[in-house]
From Swiss-Prot:
Organism: Actinobacillus succinogenes (strain ATCC 55618 / DSM 22257 / CCUG 43843 / 130Z)
Enzyme class, first EC level, given as a word: transferase
An annotated GO cellular component: cytosol
Name under which the protein is recorded: Thymidylate kinase
Gene3D superfamilies named in the record: P-loop containing nucleotide triphosphate hydrolases
One MF annotation (Gene Ontology) recorded for this entry: ATP binding
Source species, domain of life: Bacteria
GO biological process: dTDP biosynthetic process; dTTP biosynthetic process; dUDP biosynthetic process
Length: 210
């Protein structure tokens, strides 16, 4: 079987880290063990430096478009230098965020023009996209409360509840129209969330054998 690219998406506090472990365990139980893990922004030396600029306060205000362009610079470095080579080698790539995050956070939360967003995506990524996306859906207030419980919030996490409400609305619009995406209700108890993720991953893997 060819390598596949699976991405976990969601707001802060949605439980992506726990979900990633569930995805990995389920894939391994199905005999898929040659895995590569990525995170966005980040995943290459240059992309990790950009991550620091994006997520932490700088000496000058970061404009919304500058933020977006840094995200795409980090993303294309990761796609070309890590993800595509891994897929070509038959490995499965598990990503903590990908382009849907930019469409939701910068397109929805920041309110950047959607035509501009789509043009940039097409120019940078071409037709490259995940084979399967799991979107962990949670109420923004609950997610932010969980994130605060982990410690200090980064620059983007400090954006405020209205920002995250807009981000979630855009996420839901995007996954509703994406046949390669599944919504997981992350407000359920951990056992139910785990079972839903296991079921979705199993169904996806089985579909690849068809």
């Amino acid at each position: 079987m060819k390598g596949k690219f699976i991405v976990l998406e969601g707001l802060e506090g949605a439980g992506k880290t726990t979900a990633l472990h569930t995805v990995v365990e389920q894939l391994r139980s199905l005999g898929i063990t040659d895995l590569v893990f990525t995170r966005e922004p980040g995943g290459t030396p240059l992309a990790e430096k950009l991550r620091q600029l994006i997520k932490h306060e700088t000496e000058e205000p970061v404009t919304d478009k500058a933020e977006l362009l840094m995200l795409y610079a980090a993303r294309i470095q990761l796609v070309e230098n890590v993800i595509k080579p891994a897929l070509a080698a038959g490995k499965w790539v598990i990503g903590d965020r990908h382009d849907l995050s930019s469409q939701a956070y910068q397109g929805g939360g920041r309110g950047l023009d959607r035509h501009f967003m789509q043009t940039l995506k097409d120019s940078v990524l071409g037709g490259f996209e995940p084979d399967f996306t799991l979107y962990l859906d949670i109420e923004p207030a609950e997610g932010l409360a969980r994130a605060r419980g982990r410690g200090e919030l980064d620059r983007i996490e400090q954006a405020g509840l209205d920002f995250f409400n807009r981000t979630r609305t855009r996420y839901l619009e995007l996954v509703r129209d994406n046949p390669k995406a599944v919504v997981i209700n992350a407000r359920q108890n951990i056992e139910r969330v785990t079972a839903d993720i296991q079921s979705a991953v199993k169904k996806f893997v089985e579909s690849q054998h068809g």
